[in-house]
């Protein structure tokens, strides 16, 4: 799984070189932020049902047309699938926080997502709205520490930047 550490080592190994000072500083920074990432991952794990529900509710509140006939949320089954997708991405964000890199999102979440959404007529903007709501809702210190929030928000923004 891709992380700052595995990416650094793989690149240097492919070049037949030792990691540079800059490489090691990057790895060290990643390790120093690990406690904050793990805190964010723990908080997400503990309350993911509520986070997913609020994100999905915000999405459907912003895009009310999604529940009209022929749209992505025109039946309870389709609405449930939207919540399932949000939950899936939250898990991938959680995994990315744990490993300290975007590997889980890149490998399991982003690849092909645009094509699937287009094929199923699912608007990416609705998912972006759900994650933007989650990002904007994070409250320090109610939800997590400031550094944990920075890590979590960074992961949410990463997902939104690729959509």
UniProtKB/Swiss-Prot annotation:
Membrane topology: Peripheral membrane protein
Classification via Pfam families: Phycobilisome (PF00502)
Entry PTM: Contains two covalently linked bilin chromophores.
Superkingdom to which the source organism belongs: Eukaryota
Alphabetical keyword list: Antenna complex, Bile pigment, Chloroplast, Chromophore, Electron transport, Membrane, Photosynthesis, Phycobilisome, Plastid, Thylakoid, Transport
InterPro entries the UniProt entry points to: Globin-like_sf, Phycobilisome_asu/bsu, Phycobilisome_asu/bsu_sf
Binding-site list for (2R,3E)-phycoerythrobilin 2: 139
GO cellular component: chloroplast thylakoid membrane; phycobilisome
List of residues binding (2R,3E)-phycoerythrobilin 1: 82
Compartment(s) where it occurs, according to its Swiss-Prot or TrEMBL record: Plastid, Chloroplast thylakoid membrane
Biological process terms in GO annotation: photosynthesis
Claim: Electron transport is one of the keywords in the record: yes
Predominant cellular place of this UniProt entry's protein: plastid
UniProt-listed PANTHER family: C-PHYCOCYANIN ALPHA SUBUNIT, PHYCOBILISOME 32.1 KDA LINKER POLYPEPTIDE, PHYCOCYANIN-ASSOCIATED, ROD 2-RELATED
Family, similarity comment: Belongs to the phycobiliprotein family.
Primary role: Light-harvesting photosynthetic bile pigment-protein from the phycobiliprotein complex.
Assembly and interaction partners: Heterodimer of an alpha and a beta chain.
Name of protein: R-phycoerythrin alpha chain
Organism this protein belongs to: Aglaothamnion neglectum (Red alga)
Gene: cpeA
